[in-house]
A protein has these predicted regions:
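Hydrophobic alpha-helical membrane segments
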Residues: 85-94, 112-135, 150-160
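Generic alpha-helical transmembrane segments
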Residues: 25-28, 58-62, 80-96, 157-161
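Membrane-helix boundary/juxtamembrane motif in polytopic membrane proteins
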Residues: 98-129, 171-193
Length: 195
């Protein structure tokens, strides 16, 4: 259905919590595949396709600017723009997830999707702010504060992305397209276990 691609793309986004943007273009490919497959389910998944495409495109200059030593200051702004695009993708994907879980009657997953949207808002706002602030000239004391805040945001990011991956896995396990016919369960080779 597309939730498998979504799960792979979500797992590839884990390194962005520590500022490692090199996996974002690869994750964007999987997220685009998921958005394309899930676009027929509801509109927010269609929007997530375009946002994943934009995130993949924005990640390339962020990577290039990070590699070139003279442009390290500009890399923070490119990474901030990439984070905002990934944030918008998360909002669209989680909205689509909330809609589809409501339609299928999965009340707990519906509540989890809305809870994850709130956590994503908090995490990505802090991460984008700290990514841009990291490139600014600050005093030594402010630099120590930003370093400590970065560690807290990294921990929060790992929790948020793990919660989103869990939600995606649960949706993958519980939701299928209406035209999909459930396959009959194959006979067990160990009949004595079922008896």
């Amino acid at each position: 259905m597309g939730f498998g691609w979504l799960l792979i793309g979500e797992m590839l986004l884990f390194p962005i919590t520590v500022g490692f943007f090199y996996t974002v273009p690869v994750a964007a490919v999987f997220l685009c595949l998921a958005g394309y497959r899930l676009a027929r389910v509801n509109r927010p998944f269609g929007v997530s396709f375009y946002l994943a495409l934009l995130a993949g495109v924005l990640a390339v200059p962020a990577i290039v600017l990070r590699v070139i030593p003279a442009t390290d200051g500009l890399a923070h702004y490119a990474e901030g723009a990439t984070l905002l695009c990934i944030f918008a993708w998360h909002l669209a994907a989680l909205t689509g997830m909330a809609w589809v879980t409501k339609e299928t009657g999965l009340v707990k997953l519906h509540a989890v999707a809305y809870r994850n949207r709130i956590f994503c808002c908090i995490y990505f706002a802090l991460a984008a702010f700290l990514t841009v602030a990291d490139g600014l000239p600050v005093s030594e004391e402010a630099g120590r504060f930003l370093t400590g805040a970065n560690y807290a945001v990294i921990a929060l990011g790992l929790v948020v992305l793990a919660l989103n991956a869990y939600l995606t896995f649960r949706a993958y396990a519980n939701i299928c397209m209406p035209e999909d016919v459930e396959m009959p369960r194959p006979a067990s080779h160990f009949r004595f276990i079922k008896q």
